[in-house]
């Protein structure tokens, strides 16, 4: 797909024969004109198959995974988004998009998943039910990096990326471990902020750099200076 970029594109094959192209779009917010964007992606997929002189054209299926806490409230087909003269309506092809509201899945639907996505979906369901929810899912995660990156993007919380970079990342096996690492990172950042504030206070009292560096690092001193000048 050269003309447009999808979030995820997969080829569905059986016995080495391509049966379909599956496109997946991840959304955290409702987008009014989403059906038009998807028909553009699908059109680009068909065009690329034509340009490749494929012996047969594989069908293209695009689904939207919506992670928002409110129901998708906008139209899901392009005809609903246009003012079409009734004389032309029979000749205008419609396009309907499939939206899966992840945060609104039932417990029975969650149990249907067998991959790491079950952990991700359950997290968003619980977050929607309780905004103060702290991850407590003991299910072992097979692909920790991928799950944490997805959570970081879909929640807008960069702390999940910090867990990926943390030297203790290897000990993270479940969302329970993730919650514990986030708690520790929060403590460390809190202590770091306290130390920076202490350096700023010492500078404001006129303490010399030499004296401050006896108790604090050069990095802490320079960061405190930069914050005071900002």
Protein language model annotation of sequence segments:
Residues 1-230:
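Elongated, amphipathic alpha-helical interaction scaffolds
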């Amino acid at each position: 797909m050269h003309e447009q970029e999808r979030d995820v594109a997969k080829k569905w094959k059986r016995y080495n024969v391509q049966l379909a192209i599956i496109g997946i779009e991840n959304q955290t917010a409702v987008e009014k004109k989403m059906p038009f964007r998807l028909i553009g992606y699908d059109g680009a997929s068909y065009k690329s198959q034509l340009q490749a002189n494929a012996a047969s054209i594989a069908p293209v299926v695009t689904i939207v995974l919506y992670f928002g806490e409110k129901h998708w409230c906008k139209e899901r087909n392009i005809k609903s988004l246009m003012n079409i003269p009734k004389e032309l309506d029979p000749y205008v092809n419609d396009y309907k998009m499939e939206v899966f509201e992840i945060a609104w899945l039932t417990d029975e639907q969650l149990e249907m998943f067998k991959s790491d996505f079950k952990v991700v979906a359950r997290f968003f369901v619980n977050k929607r039910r309780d905004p103060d929810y702290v991850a407590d899912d003991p299910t072992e995660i097979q692909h920790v990096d991928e799950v944490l990156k997805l959570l970081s993007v879909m929640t807008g919380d960069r702390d999940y990326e910090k867990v990926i970079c943390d030297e203790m990342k290897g000990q993270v096996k479940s969302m329970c471990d993730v919650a514990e690492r986030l708690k520790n990172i929060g403590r460390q950042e809190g202590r770091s902020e306290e130390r920076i504030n202490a350096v700023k206070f010492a500078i404001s009292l006129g303490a010399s750099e030499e004296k401050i560096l006896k108790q604090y690092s050069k990095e802490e001193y320079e960061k405190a200076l930069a914050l005071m000048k900002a």
